[in-house]
UniProtKB/Swiss-Prot annotation:
GO terms for cellular component: cytoplasm. Belongs to the Cu-Zn superoxide dismutase family. It is an enzyme of class 1 (oxidoreductase). This is Superoxide dismutase [Cu-Zn]. Its EC number is 1.15.1.1. InterPro entries: SOD-like_Cu/Zn_dom_sf (IPR036423), SOD_Cu/Zn_/chaperone (IPR024134), SOD_Cu/Zn_BS (IPR018152), SOD_Cu_Zn_dom (IPR001424). It comes from Aspergillus japonicus. PANTHER family: SUPEROXIDE DISMUTASE CU-ZN -RELATED. Pfam families: Sod_Cu.
Length: 120
């Protein structure tokens, strides 16, 4: 239930495969082999987009601008999954054994494959 936890980890994962839900999307997108971190950190996975907040209706409006997740080139996110996690992302600073790999954001709530629908 998105209203019980105000923040939800938000990440681009390595794979766009959602055949087994979010379990098949792989780890966070990390083409440069860095540790997990906050979106503004120098040392972070490219797919680390921090947290989003959903309203009481469960809807979150998200607008992301980030130089580490381009739509073209070697580090393109096209074809990868964008995942909303049930728990907040501790941004690599929580001291938990998973902080430096996943932000300890645990299970996924929902996912979607990311792609270009058309060119305008």
């Amino acid at each position: 239930n998105s209203s019980s936890v105000p923040l939800h980890g938000f990440h681009v994962h390595a794979l766009g495969d959602t055949t087994n839900g979010c379990m098949s999307t792989g780890p966070h997108f990390n083409p440069t082999g860095k540790e997990h971190g906050a979106p503004q950190d120098e040392n972070r996975h490219a797919g680390d987009l921090g947290n989003i907040t959903a309203g009481a209706d469960g809807v979150a409006n998200v607008n992301v601008s980030d130089s580490q997740i381009p739509l073209t080139g070697a580090h393109s996110i096209i074809g990868r999954a964008v995942v909303v996690h049930a728990d907040p992302d501790d941004l690599g600073k929580g001291g938990h054994e998973l902080s430096k790999t996943t932000g300890n954001s645990n299970s996924s709530m929902d996912s979607c494959a990311h792609g270009i629908q058309g060119i305008l």
